[in-house]
């Protein structure tokens, strides 16, 4: 029987052809996350393994996914564009087309997910990037931030306050935990038993916490520093299913309920519990942006 197309967005034929083709534009990005005021610099190459030479101007566009709060939707807006003159990309070669330099200092007023699209003739490619506001995180006065559940945390909770609990993301801080992973395990824990079994994150993308940290329900490159931190194994006394803000998915061999970020009521107050160790990830634009958000 002939195989039927898979009913998923990632399996659409046009998405596969976008990277698996004879001619393709390649952008050598140093990273995927930036802060406003930075300059995106990247070498551009043309991979031409088709039957004909490729020639023409190379065009690029930076598209931003801007929130439309009135319609509760997102619109894709071109915020920057330009072109580079390319004389020729001979067949059978990988040719350097030039260097992109894009100033990320205007027309973007909030933290946004963007797509950088590059095109020459019929060859098109697109790369996701994230641009964050260049602001230092500041804990609101109404929130008690702590790395220990100390007497002050108990007092705040007893009085109906909010506690943000964020220890160092290491095994000594979370005894009943595993190291989380950005990707799934290799093959299976049954075949390679030294793996801890983490299978990536499931994210409540519409949670208010992510208003200034655009995300999908799964991890993308902006999650790399956070996704590889600890994930706590929830005790049996926690009613399942538990609706964590960030759930760490477990291997089929264990099926342990795990989380990296969740909120709950403790006594009269509210507790935001994090295993991400964001205070130690402030060298990353994405780490700073998530803590600020």
Question: What do these predicted regions represent?
Answer:
Residues 39-86, 96-103, 110-120:
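Beta-strand-rich binding/interaction modules
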Residues 1-39, 45, 67:
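Extended substrate-binding grooves/exosites of carbohydrate-active enzymes
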Residues 34, 88-94, 108, 157:
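Hydrophobic beta-strand core residues of beta-sandwich domains
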Residues 171-173, 187-285:
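Catalytic beta-strand/loop cores that center a nucleophilic Ser/Cys/Thr
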Residues 287-293:
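Short amphipathic C-terminal alpha-helix that caps PH/PH-like domains
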Residues 141-188, 268, 274:
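Short alpha-beta junction capping motif
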Residues 30-32, 83-90, 104-105:
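Beta-strand-rich interaction surfaces with strong enrichment in secreted/lumenal proteins
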Residues 83-88, 122-140:
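Short beta-strand elements
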């Amino acid at each position: 029987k002939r195989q039927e197309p898979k009913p998923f967005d990632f399996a659409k034929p046009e998405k596969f052809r976008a990277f698996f083709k004879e001619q393709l534009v390649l952008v050598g990005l140093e990273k995927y996350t930036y802060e406003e005021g930075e300059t995106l610099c990247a070498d551009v190459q043309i991979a031409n393994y088709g039957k004909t030479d490729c020639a023409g101007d190379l065009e690029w566009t930076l598209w931003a996914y801007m929130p439309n709060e009135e319609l509760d939707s997102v619109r894709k807006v071109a915020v920057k564009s330009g072109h580079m003159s390319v004389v020729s990309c001979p067949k059978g070669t990988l040719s350097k087309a030039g260097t992109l330099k894009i100033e990320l200092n205007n027309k973007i007023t909030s933290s946004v997910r963007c797509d950088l699209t590059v095109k020459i003739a019929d060859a098109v490619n697109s790369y996701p990037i994230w641009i964050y506001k260049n602001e230092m995180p500041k804990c609101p006065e109404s929130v008690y931030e702590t790395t220990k559940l100390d007497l002050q945390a108990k007092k705040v909770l007893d009085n109906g306050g909010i506690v943000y609990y964020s220890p160092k993301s290491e095994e000594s801080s979370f005894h009943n935990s595993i190291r989380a992973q950005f990707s799934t395990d290799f093959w299976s824990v049954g075949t390679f038993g030294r793996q801890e079994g983490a299978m990536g994150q499931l994210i409540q993308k519409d949670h208010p916490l992510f208003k200034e940290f655009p995300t999908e329900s799964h991890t993308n490159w902006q999650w790399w520093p956070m996704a590889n931190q600890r994930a706590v194994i929830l005790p049996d006394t926690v009613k399942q299913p538990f609706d964590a803000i960030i759930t760490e998915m477990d291997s089929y061999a264990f099926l342990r309920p795990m989380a990296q970020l969740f909120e709950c009521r403790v006594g009269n107050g509210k507790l935001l519990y994090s295993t991400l160790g964001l205070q130690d990830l402030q060298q990353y634009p994405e780490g700073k942006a998530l803590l600020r958000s």
